[in-house]
């Protein structure tokens, strides 16, 4: 679910942004943007010159200098406004989160168990390791892990999703977020962070932090813009002695106007806004990025590691068939499979119990009365089961059961291998059931590939992004599903160690890797990946290891994250192209006007036939300021994104923003020149 989007020019945000734009005229704020700092200095210099001219301290046209000075200040204000508006939109999103933070009291337990004596303490005094009790209608006072109990939790204040979720002790759904509300039952929670370090605190700080760190690409582009600015500064500085030697020295006001029109002020004024807006768009998709660096990395990703279940398939694998080994009755296999699944709360485990009930009327046994020992599934063992009445029953992946059988002195039957291959070739997942060292047979689990996913992978492939399916299934099943879904590669029988090794392998090849995860066992791989999207429903360890958190806990969101990242990079590249192309057109307006008196031959460059030198220079300066405002919507919303190859994207960029950057100034400056002339302002 996405958050409600703010209108692009929300009146309250515009007013606040205008106030902030004026505050940002402070030289300390301007220094952070070298290109606009040059414009700020030029504005100050021309203001002083116009005052001196008005006071007859200096010769010259005071009105013309004042007009140039005024529009240079407007240029700086518009650049400040673009950044302030982008920041204001992010802060507005953060304010909705601030409303979740409530000063409340918590029941701090003296012992880590339900029913223990409790002390009433302010929620903001809870420390990491404290144990609290929350009951129906209570606000959860801190981020933490559920150590006892289970409850329905309303997380809409953070995720925007109205449907309640279940949080319970054990497994990957034990993580809770401070500020959410208990709807029913109770939880005993161990706080996992100190005050000021909660997930909500980090979200708010991230979206409204004034000191946003620049990303590597942003730094590289800033260096390029500074280099261009220095080149134009030196070139402009040399023009005065040339014109003076020619007998008609160009005024400092005109030289400043020339410099401002030639340096890349358009992208210089919008660069910060593009970065802030990219993070804001990510938040609009209900994904929290810990930094702009993470959003930028998403745009550069060329390998996606996608979990099969929930991302590529619908994730509701159901037991469809019991296939007994030679000499074993199907009912005996079903009975053992049901016993091994009684404590398995996964959808697959419940479906095995139900299938046994439907096929052979095997009623679900009372777990408490069995006096059995249940063996939970782990990523390392890849088995689960039950020990009951001297019977040791296990179900799990083929390789895991094979190792288990051989470790217990048994032999894995060849006919079961054939049955496993048959199930796998059909795209189903085979689970093998064993009692002691005797293999009883195979359970077939069927899953369905999501509609339209193959087309989405084809689009990613066109963009040069490799898709890799991660699954715990055996190689045959994985290969069948990979072929059906259209992924480029797959990792079968995946373990946390195997995922980590695969990420490192791709990174060693110079690739950037993105993945999702929700469990504690995903934390090492999430920490290693370049873009790591942790599920909000996952464990605290997973959320701390990732550099993004998906509030909707939707693994498919990873593809959208990559799209948003690429859109931000495309927006930056497109506006840079437009800005530099702009400079070429402004060259034809201002150079002839500034130097035609000294070098009449330059009149040949006056292809726009502007009214007079003063109107030409003023028109170029006005256009230079106004174009920033006209491009603010594009900077905030991003350019339209289409999955294309890199070469096709470059061609499209050059045609639209390169050619557009050349033509728009010719039209704009000519129109402004006509208006100034008609109104008698020059």
UniProtKB/Swiss-Prot annotation:
Binding of Mg(2+), residues = 518, 522
A cellular-component GO term for this protein = plasma membrane
Q: What domain of life does the UniProt record list for this protein's source? A: Bacteria
EC numbers, comma separated: 7.2.2.6
Which cellular compartments is it found in?
A: Cell inner membrane
Membrane-spanning intervals of the chain:
34-54, 62-82, 219-239, 254-274, 588-608, 616-636, 656-676
Q: Which residues bind ATP?
A: 344, 348, 377-384, 395
- Molecular function terms in GO for this entry? ATP binding; ATP hydrolysis activity; magnesium ion binding; P-type potassium transmembrane transporter activity
UniProt cross-references to InterPro entries, sorted A to Z: ATPase_P-typ_cyto_dom_N (IPR023299), ATPase_P-typ_P_site (IPR018303), ATPase_P-typ_TM_dom_sf (IPR023298), ATPase_P-typ_transduc_dom_A_sf (IPR008250), HAD-like_sf (IPR036412), HAD_sf (IPR023214), P-type_ATPase_bsu_IA (IPR006391), P_typ_ATPase (IPR001757)
Question: What positions constitute the catalytic site?
Answer: 307 (4-aspartylphosphate intermediate)
Signal peptide segment: none
Q: How does it sit in the membrane?
A: Multi-pass membrane protein
Which terms are listed as keywords in the entry?
ATP-binding, Cell inner membrane, Cell membrane, Ion transport, Magnesium, Membrane, Metal-binding, Nucleotide-binding, Phosphoprotein, Potassium, Potassium transport, Translocase, Transmembrane, Transmembrane helix, Transport
Q: Which reaction does it catalyse?
A: K(+)(out) + ATP + H2O = K(+)(in) + ADP + phosphate + H(+)
What family does the database annotate?
Answer: Belongs to the cation transport ATPase (P-type) (TC 3.A.3) family. Type IA subfamily.
How does this polypeptide assemble, per the annotation? Answer: The system is composed of three essential subunits: KdpA, KdpB and KdpC.
What role is this protein assigned? Part of the high-affinity ATP-driven potassium transport (or Kdp) system, which catalyzes the hydrolysis of ATP coupled with the electrogenic transport of potassium into the cytoplasm. This subunit is responsible for energy coupling to the transport system and for the release of the potassium ions to the cytoplasm.
UniProt-listed PANTHER family:
POTASSIUM-TRANSPORTING ATPASE ATP-BINDING SUBUNIT (PTHR43743:SF1)
Protein name in UniProt: Potassium-transporting ATPase ATP-binding subunit
